[in-house]
């Protein structure tokens, strides 16, 4: 039997019912099927400790912005419930449960709106863990409450069930049979069924014994026939119902098998052809090279190989329609997914999203398998390191241990992953312009440096394309800024998404500054990386950090400017505007 993804909802029109549901979420009232000793396992994923207050805050905001009162008898909030088959939760690893939580929250925010989802909590103190919370149905087009946008009609409700189940497919959770005659079950009724216990009918009376004038054998026979008739009237409908249930279960199992087979077939067929995406974007095959796609402005030169693409102009590639759109249009993940849904349909776009995740996972696995073992640079030739750094305008009193030299005399900036394990090195040639990664380096690791940062303190984070640029940034920070605590990070080339390491470091930062090159490629990547960080950390202060325009002409990155500042590189004179005389 397959394991199912469970999604339930309940509409609330009054403050009273919202508060009652909130008390259940926060365990403010007795919950029979909850274990008090496991209450500490519960977790707030979004919102405050008072979900009803989160709803009230959003409703007040809507009234203030629209200048109109809430409609009487209108739906003010939707209570959401996300669960799974008990069998799945019993076998799931902690990592799988974490993925389930993350994907569920992402799906809810993408489906109902990130700001509309005001509260979400994990209940782990019950037999089967589940998520519950509130969404306020604010229409993004009108700014007013409009639950019908998401919950109007059987088709819309079916789409919600299909959408949530699709997001759960990678975890092995499936949708129930589409078109089943089973009816929607309200959240409270779902809890009620969990808590329901068998109750005996107190009205059953024992038969009155016969009088002395009644033949006992005749009386017993009459009572037996009467009891048999009475029992049959109760048992026969139950037997018929049980038979129908068995037949329905067989039919459902057959339907699930057919659905599973159809999904397996669809997995090999339904990826959106990248050529169709490029055509929709207005690109055409180059007449001189039928393998390359070009746009009218000649910004892109793209070749495609099945599910993969490569842009020769930017020297960057990726996999799938979502990556392709993010690269060519500059949209973030959500924007690209919405674009695909508008033009190719919701189901197709959703499937491409799953393939995108699968593709990235396969790439990481293959890279890890094929990557040779990284050999740690053992040398620390300080004279050579100092000579190179001084030539770039950088000086240290003491060379950090994270800067070494390899067997070929290259300067190596050591890269660590999210577990502080050495996983690679960024290399710079001392006698040539060589730069790259050491053999076996992981793209999930980064070179980092810190100034006045303690383990438990916040810091300002500066992210650059190279270790040299990251260190150069310090030359443009005020003493007050440096004293407050600064962390530097290199992405070893442009990056438009978050690695585990980068996510961990960004999470602890009070502000993030993307200090990428100010050429076209660097700024396109900076814009995408800013968007990715804002999507992951909506309240985080993030900016694309650039020098004043008058300084940009002296180079294309922060080390160029540092070398100009240190007198190691000549300044570039600004272009003079020539005033022309107008002749009549």
From Swiss-Prot:
The keyword Plastid appears for this protein: no
Ranges for domain Toprim: 459-548
GO molecular function, a single term: DNA binding
Signal peptide extent: none
GO biological process, any: DNA recombination
Domain of life: Bacteria
Protein name as catalogued: 65 kDa protein
Keywords for the protein's UniProt record, in alphabetical order: Plasmid
